[in-house]
Amino acid sequence: MTKFILKILWLDENVALAVDQVVGKGTSPLTKYFFWPRNDAWEELKKELESKHWISDLDRVELLNKATEVINYWQEEGRNRPMAEAQLKFPEVTFTGSA
């Protein structure tokens, strides 16, 4: 997943997911943020990644699997935990937010 970075916006009532592409030594936004549970963020992210035909199936599956893990964690216990704990649990994901 080094070609892409899963970004998470960690909020009290929602979690949002986006993907950036690694370009040189920086990153470039690849998708907008998709919010859960306000919308079906996973399904929206899946459709967005599928529309970018140059993303390999392997990269897409890795991103979606990690998104699933983060959403499940947030639903089951994470929404009541500080963002710092989520960062420790998912060190390969970039977090930002207010929680």
Swiss-Prot record:
GO biological process: translation
MF terms (GO), sorted A to Z: structural constituent of ribosome
Keywords: Ribonucleoprotein, Ribosomal protein
Keyword Acyltransferase in record: no
Keyword Ribonucleoprotein: yes
Any one of the GO CC terms: ribosome
Superkingdom of origin: Bacteria
Disulfide bonds: none
Recorded family membership: Belongs to the chloroplast-specific ribosomal protein cS23 family.
Subunit structure: Part of the 30S ribosomal subunit.
Function, in words: Probably a ribosomal protein or a ribosome-associated protein.
Protein name: Probable small ribosomal subunit protein cS23
